[in-house]
């Protein structure tokens, strides 16, 4: 596990808090059928934990979301459902009612969804380029009732990132809620955050869904060098 880790939680079959951070493969496609076909033909592994960026799909009606959730359940594939942007609430309500393994919701939606998760794990998240705003959001979400917290911040300088990494390490020493810390800017920063504090890290599949996102193999090689 990271040098400073949180309590264990499960997202489907995946236990967050194992010996190394879980590598989550972040994906989006034109439509659900394209994604499902790639899984069925083994272009994409059915052994991964996926983040499905449904807001980046071209075809993304509620009916498409329901088709996606049903297909993933039939294939027994675990995932984090993510939707950024307009009408996010209705997509998350659907995901929770249909018992998706996990959802990644913006901090502003915490406590505002009518559907109450019984199976679905809730990850509260906040994205910014303001370091102080990120730290404030981290404190607020750790104190909320979400299962896990994700904060992402854009950096241009090493010292900015290293300063925040130290502050998050200090927080992790006393507070046990699982955390994903995503420093956007340089790819190695993501691996370093995984080594020290992040219980999960995000990798690209065919193409990145966020700035500086590497393929999964990058993390495996970095962690091999750092952990052993």
Swiss-Prot record:
GO terms for molecular function: 3-dehydroquinate dehydratase activity. The keyword Transmembrane helix does not apply. The keyword ATP-binding does not apply. Involved in the third step of the chorismate pathway, which leads to the biosynthesis of aromatic amino acids. Catalyzes the cis-dehydration of 3-dehydroquinate (DHQ) and introduces the first double bond of the aromatic ring to yield 3-dehydroshikimate. Homodimer. This is 3-dehydroquinate dehydratase. GO terms for biological process: 3,4-dihydroxybenzoate biosynthetic process; amino acid biosynthetic process; aromatic amino acid family biosynthetic process; chorismate biosynthetic process. Keywords: Amino-acid biosynthesis, Aromatic amino acid biosynthesis, Lyase, Schiff base. InterPro entries: Aldolase_TIM, DHquinase_I, Type-I_3-dehydroquinase. Belongs to the type-I 3-dehydroquinase family. Pathway: Metabolic intermediate biosynthesis; chorismate biosynthesis; chorismate from D-erythrose 4-phosphate and phosphoenolpyruvate: step 3/7. Its EC number is 4.2.1.10. 3-dehydroquinate binds at residues 26, 51-53, 84, 190, 209, 213. The active site is at residues 127, 150. It catalyses: 3-dehydroquinate = 3-dehydroshikimate + H2O. Gene3D superfamilies: Aldolase class I (3.20.20.70). SUPFAM superfamilies: Aldolase. It comes from Thermoplasma acidophilum (strain ATCC 25905 / DSM 1728 / JCM 9062 / NBRC 15155 / AMRC-C165).
